From Swiss-Prot:
It catalyses: dUMP + (6R)-5,10-methylene-5,6,7,8-tetrahydrofolate = 7,8-dihydrofolate + dTMP. InterPro entries: Thymidate_synth/dCMP_Mease, Thymidate_synth/dCMP_Mease_dom, Thymidate_synth/dCMP_Mease_sf, Thymidylate_synthase. This is Thymidylate synthase. The gene is thyA. The keyword DNA damage does not apply. It is found in: Cytoplasm. (6R)-5,10-methylene-5,6,7,8-tetrahydrofolate binds at N51, D193, A287.
């Protein structure tokens, strides 16, 4: 994961100071690319401990086409909580619930969750129902039928419904590329929180590549991560500085249940991460 640490150093050394939408302030660079060879290990960050359980659950949530946080919080995944809670606080339904009380009610009250837990037509909706099109199914089908196509694309960016999303897609589009029996994937990400988001995204889309490879009978090769605005929030600089002083550990190994070849059939127990060693947890506040 030296590529990630190089990104961190480049932003600290060359990043421009910017005032962002959240008013937190960032150091930012524009147009950056990292490459990860999955044959050399699974690119899960080792310079801080990653919550891989959350990565799996969120990816399954996307694949299912779900956009409501109820599934996530029922599985103790809390990375999306702030956005529906913020909307709830600004609504006429607000009853002075704390964030934790709000989440507890999402878990136990299905009707409440249906009203207040939805994030709008974000990733899962766009992947599985982009103006009526199941892009994920079409992508896998096209890889099987026409592997050398230059149109092996999936996008989460639909300008007609951006205003209906609580957070417009940051990781916008993927493109797959097949060479012989190997498949690679490039992600274009318009905006990347380098401390909290980018490590998560690297692992998530690398895992998606492994899944798609298994569903198409190919071998996962390279994940290429292209970022538009790559930024470190001012309140994350100390954590980043700690990480770049650490020597990365050997990458873990990721395996799937070999009997699953239908992307709709994967469950949490079909994923197996082996030999993951990391430094300790580094916490940071998400900018909403």
């Amino acid at each position: 994961m030296q590529a990630y640490l190089n990104l961190c150093r480049d932003i600290l050394n060359y990043g421009k100071k910017k005032i962002d939408r959240t008013k937190t302030g960032t150091r930012s660079i524009f147009g950056y690319q990292m490459r990860f060879n999955l044959e050399k290990g699974f690119p899960l960050l080792t310079t801080k401990k990653m919550n891989f359980k959350a990565i799996i659950h969120e990816l399954l949530w996307f694949i299912k086409g779900d956009t409501n946080i109820r599934y996530l919080v029922q599985n103790n995944v809390n990375i999306w909580n702030e956005w529906p809670y913020q909307k709830y606080c600004n609504s006429n339904f607000f009853q002075n619930l704390t964030l934790q009380e709000f989440i507890d009610k999402i878990i136990i009250d299905e009707k409440f969750a249906k009203i207040h837990g939805d994030l709008g037509p974000i990733y899962g909706h766009q992947w599985r129902n982009f103006q009526g099109i199941d892009q994920l199914t079409d992508l896998i089908s096209e890889i099987k039928k026409n592997p050398h196509s230059r149109r092996l694309i999936l996008t989460a960016w639909d300008p007609t419904v951006i205003k209906d999303m609580l957070l417009p897609p940051c990781h916008v589009m993927i493109q797959c590329y097949v060479e012989k029996n190997k498949i690679s994937m490039q992600l274009y990400q318009r905006s990347g929180d380098v401390f909290l988001g980018i490590p998560f995204n690297i692992a998530s889309y690398s895992l998606l590549l492994i899944i798609i490879a298994q569903c198409t009978g190919l071998k996962p090769f390279e994940f290429i991560h292209t970022i538009g605005d790559a930024h470190i929030y001012n309140n994350h600089i100390e954590q980043i500085q700690k990480q770049i002083k650490r020597i990365p550990k050997k990458l873990p190994i990721m395996t799937l249940n070999p009997h699953i070849i239908d992307i709709n059939q994967f469950t949490f127990n079909d994923f197996n991460l082996e030999k993951y060693e990391s430094y300790g947890i580094l916490k940071g506040v998400v900018a909403v």
